[in-house]
Amino acid sequence: MAQTKFRSFYSRMWQKIFSLPINPKLDPKDIKGEYLNFLMRNKDWIYDLYFTCRMPPFTQDAMGDVFFTDDMEMQVIEMALWLSDITKIPLSATFNNIYVRPDQKGLDMFISNFKQLYDVGVKIVTLPHTSWVLTGQIQKEYPELYIKNTILREVTRPNEIVQLAQAGFNYINLDRDLMRDRDRLIEIKEAKEYCAEQGYPVKLS
């Protein structure tokens, strides 16, 4: 009986394969209506809900979009927290602007400002700078944080998987062009297995 329950739980965890966006430009009525209904129907397949977050030093996203006012930013965060509370799907804050300077000043600013999200339950984050993660400062301040890399870094090689895992990333987004390269995907899978053997397991997407 216990083994059956464990297998069922394990199966449910592995079927959570989709990371879905919370689009800040959607009408709140649509989010609370059709989108919420969709999430409730399919939440067993959804890994997390991600939203682009604007806070210093990430005041623009990777495309330079600055449509947020402070009030709009708070509305997005509040809506994300509400969706997560209703659906029980974890939230993921996305900071993907690779053009933000990866210096210590920016890292200190991020660590200070992220506390407001961490304290309300946001425990997954996408970050653009490997050098920040490599310092261990973020992990020390936020020990329960699960860290993703940004897809904008275009990870395509097995050695990059190993380097990112060693740096401290828990989840690695692969470049989408790899979907057409079966041989390279096999090499990527072997790199993932190597990371697990060395004590720094990662999830790939």
Where do the language-model regions lie?
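Extended hydrophobic/aromatic-rich secondary-structure runs
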Residues: 1-13
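A general structural signal for short secondary-structure junctions and capping/turn motifs
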Residues: 8-11, 39-41, 195-198
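Extreme N-terminal starter segment of soluble prokaryotic enzymes
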Residues: 14-18
